[in-house]
């Protein structure tokens, strides 16, 4: 049985407003703690990819890679609107990190569409 729910609009449904805001608040805290404007400019100037920040985003405390994975499989159960909202907030911080985050989200699609129990 495929994981994908065939119900119309399922990919848009996603998180309830409170949960979405909680994830957005987490992104804001990440920015405040790790992504000052000076640090982002330093990444650009030195042509550094901030691997440690990506690892933090994907770590057990934040787990942003779980956004689009259904809750039944350990994810957050987010939808396209959630991905858009979070990507938009991240783009205000750093496009490089946003691109990495969105690329990681693309990896959820094959799991949702083709994985079996």
Where are these regions (language model features)?
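N-terminal glycine-rich flavin-associated loop
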Residues: 98-117
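Amphipathic, small/basic residue-rich leader segments at the start of a protein or domain
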Residues: 1-101
């Amino acid at each position: 049985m495929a994981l994908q729910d065939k119900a119309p609009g399922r990919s848009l449904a996603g998180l309830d407003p409170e949960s979405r805001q909680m994830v957005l608040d987490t992104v804001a805290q990440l920015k405040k703690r790790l992504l000052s404007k000076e640090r982002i400019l330093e990444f650009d100037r030195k042509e550094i990819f901030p691997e440690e920040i990506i690892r933090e985003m994907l770590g057990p405390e934040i787990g942003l890679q779980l956004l689009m994975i259904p809750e039944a499989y350990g994810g957050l159960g987010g939808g396209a609107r959630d991905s858009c909202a979070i990507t938009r907030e991240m783009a205000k911080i750093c496009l490089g990190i946003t691109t990495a985050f969105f690329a990681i989200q693309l990896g959820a699609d094959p799991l949702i569409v083709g994985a079996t129990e």
